[in-house]
From Swiss-Prot:
Mg(2+) binds at residues 33, 54. Coiled coil: none annotated. GO terms for biological process: division septum assembly. Its cofactor is Mg(2+). GO terms for molecular function: GTP binding; metal ion binding. Keywords: Cell cycle, Cell division, GTP-binding, Magnesium, Metal-binding, Nucleotide-binding, Septation. It comes from the Bacteria. This is Probable GTP-binding protein EngB. It comes from Ureaplasma urealyticum serovar 10 (strain ATCC 33699 / Western). One of its GO terms (cellular component) is cytosol. Pfam families: MMR_HSR1. GTP binds at residues 26-33, 52-56, 69-72, 135-138, 166-168. HAMAP family: GTPase_EngB.
Length: 208
C-alpha cells in the first residue's frame, strides 16, 4: 500500500537510506498529484485547481521504490523570490540526489510549451532514465497521439519509445505507467549489482 512519507524543503531533510527513487516533475497544473493518486489507487497527494500548490519535495512510499513529487516548473502565480527558491529546490534534488534512478516528466498533451522542451533537454545528459508522460489524453481525439507522436517526440527532443499517454482522470494506461516504473527500478538494481560484482572482481585481481 502506497503512503505519504514527508515533505522537505532542504536537502538535509530528505530520507537517509538507499531506497531507489522515481521522480515526477512537470509544469504547474498538469495533474501530477492526480496521477500520483491514480498510481496509488487512493488519495495520498493533495490536489488543487490552483497552479503551483506543490512548493516542497514530497516523498511517497510505493514499497519497491519511493516516488518523489517535485514543485512544478513554470512557477505559476508566485513571486520572483519564490521562483528562485523553487528553482533551487528542483536543482538540488535533480543534481545531487544519489537515490534517483529515473525521471518521469509529466506534460499536458493539450498544451506542450517551451518550458517542457527546456526541461526535457536538461535530462539529455543526466545519469538517470528520462520518460515523458502525456497526461489528460482523455481530452483529445483518440487518434491524436498516434497521428502526432513523431512530431511530439521531436518537439520534446525525446525518442518515441520514451513517450507514454495516460489519463489520471480516467485511469487510462496508469497500470502500464506503474509497471514501467517498477521495471526501471529493477533494471537499475540489477545494473548496480553487476557493477559491484565487477568492482569486486577487479579489486581481487589487483590484490593477486
Amino acid at each position: 500500500m502506497a503512503k505519504f512519507i514527508k515533505s522537505a524543503q532542504y536537502f538535509d531533510q530528505y530520507p537517509v537510506d538507499k531506497q531507489f527513487e522515481i521522480c515526477v516533475i512537470g509544469r504547474s497544473n498538469v495533474g501530477k498529484s492526480s496521477l500520483i493518486n491514480a498510481l496509488a489507487n487512493e488519495k495520498i497527494a493533495r490536489t488543487s485547481n490552483t497552479p503551483g500548490r506543490t512548493q516542497l519535495v514530497n516523498f511517497f512510499d510505493f514499497n519497491s521504490f519511493r516516488l518523489v513529487d517535485l514543485p512544478g516548473y513554470g512557477f505559476a502565480r508566485v513571486s520572483k523570490d519564490k521562483q528562485l527558491d523553487l528553482a533551487t529546490i528542483i536543482d538540488q534534488y535533480l543534481g545531487y540526489r544519489q537515490n534517483l534512478c529515473a525521471v518521469f516528466q509529466i506534460c499536458d498533451i493539450n498544451v506542450l510549451t517551451n518550458d517542457d522542451v527546456e526541461m526535457s533537454r536538461y535530462f539529455e545528459n543526466q545519469n538517470y532514465a528520462h520518460f515523458v508522460v502525456l497526461n489528460k489524453v482523455d481530452k483529445v481525439n483518440k487518434s491524436h497521439f498516434d497521428n502526432n507522436k513523431q512530431k511530439i517526440a521531436k518537439f520534446l527532443n525525446i525518442s518515441v519509445d520514451r513517450l507514454l499517454c495516460v489519463s489520471a482522470q480516467k485511469n487510462t494506461n496508469v497500470a502500464t505507467l506503474f509497471a514501467l516504473m517498477k521495471k526501471v527500478v529493477i533494471e537499475t538494481r540489477q545494473k548496480q549489482l553487476l557493477l559491484k560484482k565487477e568492482e569486486k572482481k577487479s579489486s581481487e585481481e589487483e590484490i593477486k
